[in-house]
Amino acid sequence: MSGISPTELQNLDEPSKKEIMGFLETENSKQKVQMSIHQFTNLCFKNCIHSVQSADLSAQENQCLKDCVNRFLDTNIRIVKGLQSIQ
């Protein structure tokens, strides 16, 4: 993959700069979502799955995972709302 030098970036016209910045912001947002998914997957799996007995989840494991993910999402929503109210 080739990179773009800072000099080449400075030579771009304003619409191109805005397009690149928009692309970078979108990619950054995607990365944050992916990191959150990995984080709660890891956390919830460790909390809810203690041994693998079969290819299917037990009813208890299934409910535990649902509750765990919901708690994780609710917590993140509260944090975001709290941060937004501070700004």
Swiss-Prot record:
Record-level GO cellular component terms: mitochondrial inner membrane; mitochondrial intermembrane space protein transporter complex
Alphabetical UniProt keywords: Chaperone, Disulfide bond, Membrane, Metal-binding, Mitochondrion, Mitochondrion inner membrane, Protein transport, Translocation, Transport, Zinc
Keyword Disulfide bond: yes
GO BP, sorted A to Z: protein insertion into mitochondrial inner membrane
Twin CX3C motif (motif): residue ranges: 44-68
Chaperone in keyword set: yes
Stretches assigned to coiled coil: none
Cystine pairs: 44-68, 48-64
Any GO molecular function: metal ion binding
Source superkingdom: Eukaryota
Membrane topology per record: Peripheral membrane protein
Compartments (UniProt record): Mitochondrion inner membrane
InterPro entries: Tim10-like (IPR004217), Tim10-like_dom_sf (IPR035427)
Quaternary data: Heterohexamer; composed of 3 copies of TIM8 and 3 copies of TIM13, named soluble 70 kDa complex. Associates with the TIM22 complex, whose core is composed of TIM22 and TIM54. Interacts with the transmembrane regions of multi-pass transmembrane proteins in transit.
Protein family per UniProt: Belongs to the small Tim family.
Domains as described in the record: The twin CX3C motif contains 4 conserved Cys residues that form 2 disulfide bonds in the mitochondrial intermembrane space. However, during the transit of TIM8 from cytoplasm into mitochondrion, the Cys residues probably coordinate zinc, thereby preventing folding and allowing its transfer across mitochondrial outer membrane.
Function: Mitochondrial intermembrane chaperone that participates in the import and insertion of some multi-pass transmembrane proteins into the mitochondrial inner membrane. Also required for the transfer of beta-barrel precursors from the TOM complex to the sorting and assembly machinery (SAM complex) of the outer membrane. Acts as a chaperone-like protein that protects the hydrophobic precursors from aggregation and guide them through the mitochondrial intermembrane space.
Protein name (database record): Mitochondrial import inner membrane translocase subunit TIM8
Native source organism of the sequence: Eremothecium gossypii (strain ATCC 10895 / CBS 109.51 / FGSC 9923 / NRRL Y-1056)
